């Protein structure tokens, strides 16, 4: 059974693939099969993925307010996907903020450049503080 961390890795893969080819969602089942995401974890993955897409404009507007000199679209695909996932979980789910930030940092360490973990922490921490 896949862990929640592996589920989040899959969501990042789905968001990345969506950005590269938003006209076609055939990649969804392929990515989930490849990563062995099944049953309850598949439902969790798809809920996160579709929740992000359904709220993408709101998420991006919120994130843009915490990106000093950049827009979310100026970031790399992976960094953008990690921030969108983190923001979605903070804004629309009951996942504890400490877990969201830790997962974003771990995903950034695995998938992004060396400066990304600190950047993810700063942006998502600012979002948490503004939300209170």
From Swiss-Prot:
GO terms for cellular component: cytosol. One of its GO terms (biological process) is transcription antitermination. One of its GO terms (molecular function) is RNA binding. Keywords: RNA-binding, Transcription, Transcription antitermination, Transcription regulation. Signal peptide: none annotated. It comes from the Bacteria. The keyword RNA-binding applies. The keyword RNA-binding applies. InterPro entries: NusB-like_sf, NusB_fam, NusB_RsmB_TIM44. Belongs to the NusB family. HAMAP family: NusB. Involved in transcription antitermination. Required for transcription of ribosomal RNA (rRNA) genes. Binds specifically to the boxA antiterminator sequence of the ribosomal RNA (rrn) operons. NCBIfam families: nusB. This is Transcription antitermination protein NusB. The lineage of its organism: Bacteria, Pseudomonadati, Campylobacterota, Epsilonproteobacteria, Campylobacterales. The gene is nusB.
């Amino acid at each position: 059974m896949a862990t929640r961390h592996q589920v989040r890795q899959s969501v990042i893969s789905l968001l990345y693939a969506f950005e590269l080819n938003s006209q076609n969602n055939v990649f969804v089942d392929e990515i989930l099969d490849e990563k062995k995401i099944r049953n309850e974890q598949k439902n969790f993955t798809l809920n996160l993925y579709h929740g992000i897409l359904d709220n993408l404009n709101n998420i991006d507007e919120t994130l843009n307010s915490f990106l000093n000199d950049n827009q979310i679209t100026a970031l790399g695909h992976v960094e953008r996907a990690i921030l969108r996932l983190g923001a979605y979980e903070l804004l629309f789910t009951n996942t504890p903020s400490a877990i969201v930030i830790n997962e974003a940092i771990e995903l950034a360490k695995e998938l992004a450049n060396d400066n990304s973990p600190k950047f993810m922490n700063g942006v998502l921490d600012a979002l948490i503080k503004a939300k209170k």
